[in-house]
């Protein structure tokens, strides 16, 4: 089996690329970073530090790389069985024209073996969005052929891969946590379902997308925002602060009650999942900075994201949300010199006041009880 993976950054090398290569798949990375491309093509291998209770070093081998903006990547799309991405939500639109060109070439070459494309991004139904961009870039006469022969498979991914400086200045070395989860929608594949260890197949992807968003992402963000307010440097420092831990755990339990109601998750299993996530935040090997995790507060306070979406669920089912409100209030206090969204948030609050600002960012009704609760909590933190 041959695969092409867009994005040779830390997540590409440390998570998806590693799973594909470990499964014995012939893997080529596509990227724009020439230093990384040259290193991959010179060595065809790299090291991954897997850290949890213990630390181990795995070697990923048999890989090579091409530029994501040249002809090589178009040629590969015409030949491979699987295309994956870990480029970040914004970049999906930029790689779509190259994918479209490759699909046209595949059609011209008469290659009708199934191709599946999986975007592995921190977003909901990212592959469906990528498909829209690809379809827009395709000529009309290729669209029906692509619909017939190419699967666009949505997925949910979860592995913490913080940026970390290599002790040896190796551009390929990467550190990842032990935990990883890659769940894909098995109803969207063309041809036989792949057997890749570490890839889980489901016919109810949205349940798992929301489980991750409402637990890992919600908890991570609230830990960061409360941690920053309390003067902590890392996620580990913050979650070991008992006051912060109580709010974070409480918020994940509140969002969890929504998931249990909505999708029928088992309550005991979900409680264990929350404990596992708290353990991940405590990982001493992951020097995850609260400022990095908290960045882009406007996006994180938007209606479909990790703070407001679970809050809306608690309103839908009439469930408690005190700790989620604390997290939202802390997010409104997030300030960072290096983050344009943090500066925009501060300016908006200074200009309109917290009530109107939160309503504008989140889509919540300015006169609602929850906005009033959040503003009260926000003022109590000043």
Swiss-Prot record:
GO terms for cellular component: cytosol. The modification N6-acetyllysine is found at residue 269. It is an enzyme of class 1 (oxidoreductase). The keyword Acetylation applies. It comes from the Bacteria. The keyword Membrane does not apply. InterPro entries: 6-PGluconate_DH-like_C_sf, 6PGD_dom2, Mannitol_1_phos_5_DH, Mannitol_DH, Mannitol_DH_C, Mannitol_DH_CS, Mannitol_DH_N, NAD(P)-bd_dom_sf. PANTHER family: ALTRONATE OXIDOREDUCTASE-RELATED, MANNITOL-1-PHOSPHATE 5-DEHYDROGENASE. NCBIfam families: PRK02318.1-2, PRK02318.1-3, PRK02318.1-4, PRK02318.2-2, PRK02318.2-5. Belongs to the mannitol dehydrogenase family. This is Mannitol-1-phosphate 5-dehydrogenase. The lineage of its organism: Bacteria, Pseudomonadati, Pseudomonadota, Gammaproteobacteria, Enterobacterales.
